[in-house]
Amino acid sequence: MFNLTFLGTSCMKPTKERNQFSLFVSYKNKGILVDCGEGTQRQLKHAGIKLSKINKILITHWHGDHTLGLPGLLQSMSASDYNGTLEIYGPKQTKEKIEHIFKAFEFDNKLNLKIVEVKPG
């Protein structure tokens, strides 16, 4: 059985009641984070979802309201006892953008990443 947890349902501007978009899908012992808007880590904590439950991250597109939480999330996951391979799926240039995140925020990446660029369609 799938379990969906809406972590954010707002658009570019978060409101008092709604964060920028992010969705957590759990299935058995797997966890998929769909997009990572600003404030996603806080919403994960409120929902009782541990970072270690995230196996895959799906980036639908690279607008800020879907990705501004990603640098902090990756840094927190890298600083934690995260085990296994974190798979990140996204559109063209996802690998390049992830590399830019690590350069821009100057932290030591300890994550084993598998980055897959998905073709349209």
Residue ranges and their predicted role:
Residues 1-121:
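Binuclear metal-dependent hydrolase catalytic cores
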